[in-house]
Amino acid sequence: MPSPHFSKVLVFGATGEVGSAVALEAHALGAHVSIALRDTTKHNEWISPSQEHAADLQRISADLTDPDSLKRAVHDTGAQAAFIYAVRSKDTLRGAITALRDAGIQYLVFLSTSQVRTAGTTKGDIRSIKPDHFIPWQHAQVEIALEELEVPHAAVRAGFFASNPLRIYLDRSSEPKQVNLLAPEVPHDPIDPKDIGRAAAAVLVNPRLYASGYQGEPKKDVVYLSGPALLSQTEQWEIINRELVAAGKPEVKVNHITVEQYLENLAKLHVPDVVAKSLAKSMVETRALYAPEDYEKSRGNVELLTGRKATAFDEFVKREIPRYFD
């Protein structure tokens, strides 16, 4: 294996489904990986203790809302590059980005969202996204901060998480389990969060920015990631129920709901209203996001970056059934 461009990396969000995959894949690519945690004793449901030990993951105390902790983390680990994600902060992570840069981080990979492409008044202009479309606006603000602070970076603009139907929308409190679908026939591009993490790790450890022949912006690499097939929520749940039956488990009851009911359900889950409304908007307005000329390019990027085909939705469901239905 060739030596990695960055041999020491710092990964935030490693107790989540994407960050955990970033950490493990960065190790597999030859980097020494430190995982930044607010609570270094926190249980990690995505990386087992044996995996953490085998990958020699170093737990370090750091918080993206605490710039001083970031400076200490970089100094203590000697990290040259870091993976970050959007967290709620008054300055849209400008303080965190500045602290990481000033402490010695040379390059950042930011987990963004593909929604930023079409959420603004002008396609592709992240500065034209309004705050009321909160999710893409929040991610766009971090990208803008990275640009204005002149930090070399990659914006990994990921599509619809394949885990959303199971992690967010499945009601496991009812019997039989049920799901309430808003805009069931609208297409989405479900992508395995592990594929997102692996692709992000590839551009974290060996950035395309520094590869010979790179022709993009000098300090910004934009990476769009989509799943291998466009599927409506109806099609997704047909697949989920088929795999449940094959596994000897009861099917999930599928209900169709209005926007008002969708917002009520998210309110019960204590999702902030501004986030809930942005989620509703993103569930309904996807056709521009998956324009053929854009989707055909992004669907191949997982394989391009990782050398492995993107996980099909049915394969993802088979793998995750024990997590959500046992």
Curated annotation (Swiss-Prot):
Q: What happens when the gene is disrupted?
A: Leads to decreased production of bikaverin.
Induction (free text): Expression is repressed at alkaline ambient pH and highly induced under nitrogen starvation and acidic pH conditions.
Q: Which domain of life is it from?
A: Eukaryota
Which parts of the chain are coiled coil? none
User: Which residues take part in binding NADP(+)?
Assistant: G13, A14, T15, G16, E17, V18, F161, A162, S163, N164
Q: What does the UniProt keyword field contain?
A: NAD
Give a single Pfam family match: NmrA
Which InterPro entries does the record match to this protein?
Ergot_Alk_Oxidoreductase, NAD(P)-bd_dom_sf, NmrA-like
Keyword NAD, does the record have it? yes
Described by its record, this protein's role is as follows: Nitrogen metabolite regulation-like protein involved in the regulation of the gene cluster that mediates the biosynthesis of bikaverin, a red pigment also considered as a mycotoxin.
Q: Which family does it belong to?
A: Belongs to the NmrA-type oxidoreductase family.
Name the chain's protein. Answer: Nitrogen metabolite regulation-like protein bik4
Organism of derivation: Gibberella fujikuroi (strain CBS 195.34 / IMI 58289 / NRRL A-6831) (Bakanae and foot rot disease fungus)
Gene field: bik4
